[in-house]
């Protein structure tokens, strides 16, 4: 996020500010290992290969974000991409906060900051994510995100449990959030 975007985000009441001591930033390839570790240690996310997190930091940096701590190390991350058939939709793939930094509002600040950047720079109008019914933290995070931005949420099962090859995988419920209004002064 540039200084101008941070000023814009700070002026909007619907943007949760990044907690003191942290900085919102675009991920770099060098962050891939730390992001993989945060995802692994979350115990809630489906862990991808370490290689995929390196690729994510290279190929999807514009639609992802990290919160850096005082030592510039990633303390939290959110990964996303634009849907190929709906390029005005940001799909949030994963979001997690390192255990040492939980309870400070980093996930909400990352989600707000990334969405504000994607609306301004990429013309995003809606956000999608999938969440399993048993993931209370993510369900609360995205419900409060929609409420903070005064946008509707539509929920429907995207992938039923029977589609997954492993036993015991919960269904993935699609959360369609938006539409968001393009803020005044944005590039779109």
Residue ranges and their predicted role:
Residues 10-48:
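Short amphipathic alpha-helix that is part of the acyltransferase structural core
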Residues 40-70, 74:
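Active-site rim helix/loop that mediates acceptor-substrate recognition in acyltransferases
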Residues 66, 73-83, 89-91, 96:
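Conserved beta-strand in the GNAT
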Residues 83-92, 102, 121-124:
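A conserved beta-turn-beta hairpin within the catalytic core of GNAT-like acetyltransferases
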Residues 94-102, 131-132:
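A short, internal acetyl-CoA/4′-phosphopantetheine-binding micro-motif in the GNAT/acyltransferase core
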Residues 97, 103-117, 140:
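Conserved acetyl-CoA-binding loop-helix of GNAT-fold acetyltransferases
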Residues 108, 133-155:
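Conserved active-site alpha-helix within GNAT-family acetyltransferase domains
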Residues 118-133:
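Conserved GNAT acetyl-CoA-binding A-motif
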């Amino acid at each position: 996020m540039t200084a101008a975007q941070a000023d814009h985000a700070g002026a909007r009441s619907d943007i949760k500010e990044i907690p003191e001591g942290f900085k919102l930033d675009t991920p770099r390839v060098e962050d891939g290992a730390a992001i993989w570790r945060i995802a692994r240690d979350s115990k809630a996310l489906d862990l991808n290969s370490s290689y995929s997190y390196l690729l994510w930091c290279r190929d999807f940096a514009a639609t992802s974000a990290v919160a850096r701590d005082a030592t510039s190390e990633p303390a939290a991350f959110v990964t996303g991409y634009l849907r190929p058939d709906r390029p005005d939709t940001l799909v949030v793939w994963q979001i997690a906060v390192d255990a040492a930094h939980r309870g400070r509002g980093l996930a909400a600040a990352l989600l707000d900051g990334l969405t504000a950047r994607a609306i301004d720079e990429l013309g995003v109008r809606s956000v999608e994510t999938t969440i399993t019914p048993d993931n209370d933290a993510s369900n609360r995070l995205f419900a409060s995100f929609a409420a903070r931005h005064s946008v509707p949420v539509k929920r429907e099962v995207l992938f039923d449990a029977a589609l997954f090859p492993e036993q015991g995988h919960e269904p993935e419920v699609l959360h369609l959030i938006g539409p968001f209004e393009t803020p005044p002064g944005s590039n779109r």
